[in-house]
Every structure is written in C-alpha cells, then in structure tokens.
Amino acid sequence: MIEQCQCCGSEIRRYKGTFISGPNYILSQDNRTVTKCSDNGWNANAIGSETIPLGTITIINFKIEKTVESYIMIGIAPKTIDQKLDVAYSKCGWYYYSYTGGLYCEPPLSYSNFKFRNDSQLPEGTIITLIVDTSIGKISYKINDSLIKTAYHVSFPESIVPCVILYNKGDSIRIIQN
C-alpha cells in the first residue's frame, strides 16, 4: 500500500537506501553507518545510494552514533557532488549543522550558519529526520521526533540524494529505518 499525504496527495516514501563508498570515510558492513577515517576537515561527503524521486515526500532518519563535537552536516545534494570537495556545504546542496543548529547551503541562498534552531551541539543518540518534499521544493527537519520548521524552499535538480558531511575523525552517523 502506498502512503499518501492527506494535504497534497504526494506519495510518502521511507528512504530505503544506504550510503555508497567514497573518500575519507568508511562504511559499516551493511553500508548504513558512515565513519570519518581521515584527519579533521570538511572533506568527507557521504551520499545515499538511492536518489530521491521528484513528486514525492521522502523521509530519511539518521542517528548520531558517535561524535566529538557534533560537527556534522545533514542534508541533500545533487547526486553529482564531488565527494572530496572541501566545504561542500557552502557550494553544493542544503544542510542542517548539528553543532550550531544553523543552515548552510549553496548559492543563490548561500546560507552560512543561518540560525534555524536555538539549541546546539546535538549529542550521540540524537535522531535527525530529514523530510524532503520534491513536489513543492520543501526541506524540513525533526530532532528526536520534535518537528522544527521548514528549512528551505528550493528548486531541486533532477537527481538528489541524502548527503552527510563529517568533520571530526571517528564521528559516525547511521541511516535508520522505521
């Protein structure tokens, strides 16, 4: 049975993908957990294995497994993102920063720590839910099941994927399925 939004009729999907391999991080055996394995720096851009279809609402749940300072960006990016790109959060995609509660994104918005949430530094065990409504170009977030507001209204390129950017060596985050 296909779940549909009662407001707009869009299909609601639970993300079933995993992470794909890339530079500066390692994956768990099931490819659901990504761990930064290189020196500290914004150069580990882990992307999802499945694209987010246009015309749907896709829900993706992440769990912060391990973190030093919560220097983790969670969002979406074009599937073509350069996984080695340094500071990709300001050049390619739309992100929530779990350390400050700020938003970061590519031009033309070019957010740089735009204050989105008042608290900061999300601890280990925090569940971050990313809700992507491609039918109306909306990106929203929940923190531990508490809905915060819509973060972005944007026009999506055709192929977008979940993207997590890790800074600290040893930090890890997991795609969880409900």
PLM features: residue spans?
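PRY/SPRY (B30.2) beta-sandwich protein-interaction domains
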Residues: M1-N178
